């Protein structure tokens, strides 16, 4: 029995979905603990491409229970669309295998309208929000004005709480943002329909997960976004609104930290970022475009082209420290095939000063330029490699150097998008 947290060790989009899909084989329950449908996990199963935004990747494995924890903000419309599509494709044959925490917060229509309107007004200072209402929903959660799933399922509580908050939301929409207001009736009619579907999935998931652990079951916690997008530890304010780091697995699920055995950080063999914010190793040249095209670096949620850059060892070390990583999974190593040389950022130059750690100040990080170590590349197609020995020497040397600079052992190397295009060096579910 082991309980494992999988988190993004960069700025999100690291390939967590594929790694979670592989690890799900060894878990009994897969838990999503933060974020909302601003995240997108792309999985390739056989010849089928599946994109999930809310439901844990474990849903593609029969017999695995999937849990959406209290730390998630849920858009009922998106959730229902996702389960409908999954069922149409032969997945989720038993509704009891998908649970929603009664304590999770619901994304309301005013959250989405406020989110989009604020971003429009921001002009050049845009954060890069997906416009899906995630941030405003978390604002209401912290401000104690949120609507939880348990409220949605209680008609009287829902009516009272929405009426209490709607006057304020309409003032913000009309007076500050120049947008149309909502009537209570339109929200009530729409969300009571959602309640009928969501009711069958609602549960005290913290208690159920506790019971699973006591019964000797293994849990896999599936993070969304990445360490540098964490609301506390990321490049604030260019962050998401939730706790993307490993600590969020406990607060977002109701599982004790004492029950976590392994934390695996997922990191691309290079780096990407979506939206605004500092990105020291960004490549705005032909090489950056080559990586974008070879890696198909376009957001699964927004379709936006991702910013690309070389691997940043400072970011990796930061992720190891903040999350307590016991291992790193390197994804998309195959994307680097064909590069004459590959680079790793080993330090930053800040006004002539050499920095070996990620600076706390956003203003400092924005002025940092990378100091690179250059390694020889490789031309071979590595997608068929089943072991490290089958990789070209230069590819092996690159992985070894990344491991050395990051400060945590590499436990998995992905050499292609398919599930079987993976080299597993250590299974975190098999404790020593």
From Swiss-Prot:
Q: Its principal location? A: cytoplasm
Q: Provide an example Pfam family for this protein.
A: Adenylsucc_synt
Q: Could you say which residues bind IMP here?
A: 13-16, 38-41, 130, 144, 225, 240, 304
Name the positions where Mg(2+) binds.
13, 40
Query: Can you state which reaction this protein catalyses?
Result: IMP + L-aspartate + GTP = N(6)-(1,2-dicarboxyethyl)-AMP + GDP + phosphate + 2 H(+)
Q: Name one GO molecular function term.
A: GTP binding
| Name of the featured protein | Adenylosuccinate synthetase
Q: Where does GTP bind?
A: 12-18, 40-42, 306, 332-334, 414-416
CC terms in the record's Gene Ontology section: cytoplasm
Which InterPro entries does the protein's record reference? Adenylosuccin_syn_GTP-bd, Adenylosuccin_syn_Lys_AS, Adenylosuccinate_synth_dom1, Adenylosuccinate_synth_dom2, Adenylosuccinate_synth_dom3, Adenylosuccinate_synthetase, P-loop_NTPase
Active site as annotated: 13 (proton acceptor), 41 (proton donor)
Its subunit composition reads:
Homodimer.
Query: What's this chain's function?
Result: Plays an important role in the de novo pathway of purine nucleotide biosynthesis. Catalyzes the first committed step in the biosynthesis of AMP from IMP.
Q: Which family does it belong to?
A: Belongs to the adenylosuccinate synthetase family.
> What does the record's cofactor remark say about binding?
Binds 1 Mg(2+) ion per subunit.
Could you tell me which SMART domains the record lists for this protein?
A: Adenylsucc_synt
Which cofactors does it use? Mg(2+)
Q: Which organism is it from?
A: Geobacter sp. (strain M21)
A Gene Ontology biological process in which this protein takes part is: IMP metabolic process
Keywords noted in UniProt: Cytoplasm, GTP-binding, Ligase, Magnesium, Metal-binding, Nucleotide-binding, Purine biosynthesis
Q: Where on this chain does substrate bind?
A: 300-306
The UniProt gene name for this protein comes to purA
- E.C. number: 6.3.4.4
Cell compartments where the protein resides: Cytoplasm
So, what pathway does this thing act in? Purine metabolism; AMP biosynthesis via de novo pathway; AMP from IMP: step 1/2
């Amino acid at each position: 029995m082991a309980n494992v947290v999988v988190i993004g060790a960069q700025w999100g989009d690291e390939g967590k979905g594929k790694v979670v899909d592989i690890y799900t084989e060894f878990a009994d329950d897969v838990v999503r603990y933060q974020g909302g449908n601003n995240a997108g996990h792309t999985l390739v199963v056989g010849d089928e491409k599946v994109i999930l935004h809310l439901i844990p990747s474990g849903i593609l494995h029969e017999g695995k229970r999937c849990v959406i924890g209290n730390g998630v903000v849920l858009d009922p419309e998106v959730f229902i669309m996702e389960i409908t599509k999954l069922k149409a494709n032969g997945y989720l044959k038993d509704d009891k295998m998908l649970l929603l925490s009664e304590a999770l917060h619901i994304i309301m229509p005013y959250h989405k309208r406020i989110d989009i309107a604020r971003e429009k007004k921001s002009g050049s200072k845009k954060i890069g929000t997906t416009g899906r209402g995630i941030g405003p929903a978390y604002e209401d959660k912290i401000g104690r004005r949120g609507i939880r799933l348990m409220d949605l399922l209680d008609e009287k509580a829902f009516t009272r709480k929405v009426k209490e908050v709607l006057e304020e939301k309409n003032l913000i929409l009309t007076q500050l943002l120049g947008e149309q207001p909502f009537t209570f009736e339109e929200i009530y009619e729409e969300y009571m329909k959602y309640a009928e579907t969501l009711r069958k999935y609602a549960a005290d998931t913290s208690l159920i997960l506790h019971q699973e652990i006591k019964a000797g079951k293994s849990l896999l916690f599936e993070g969304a976004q990445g360490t540098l997008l964490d609301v506390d530890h990321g490049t604030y304010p260019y962050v998401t609104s939730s706790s993307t780091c490993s600590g969020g697995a406990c607060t977002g699920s109701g599982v004790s930290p004492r029950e976590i055995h392994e934390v695996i950080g997922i990191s691309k063999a290079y780096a990407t970022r979506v939206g605004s914010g500092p990105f020291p190793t960004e490549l705005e040249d032909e090489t950056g475009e080559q990586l974008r095209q070879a890696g198909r670096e376009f957001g699964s949620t927004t379709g936006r082209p991702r910013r690309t850059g070389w691997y940043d060892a400072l970011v990796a070390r930061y992720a190891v420290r903040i999350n307590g990583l016991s291992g790193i999974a390197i994804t998309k190593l195959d994307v680097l095939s064909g590069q004459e040389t590959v680079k790793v950022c080993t330090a930053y130059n800040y006004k002539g000063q050499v920095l070996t750690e990620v600076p706390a100040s956003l203003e400092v990080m924005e002025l940092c330029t990378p100091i690179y170590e250059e390694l020889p590349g490789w031309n071979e197609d590595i997608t068929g490699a089943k072991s490290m020995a089958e990789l070209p020497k230069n590819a092996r040397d690159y992985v070894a150097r990344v491991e050395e600079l990051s400060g945590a052992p590499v436990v998995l190397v992905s050499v292609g998008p398919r599930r079987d295009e993976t080299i597993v060096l250590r299974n975190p579910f098999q404790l020593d």
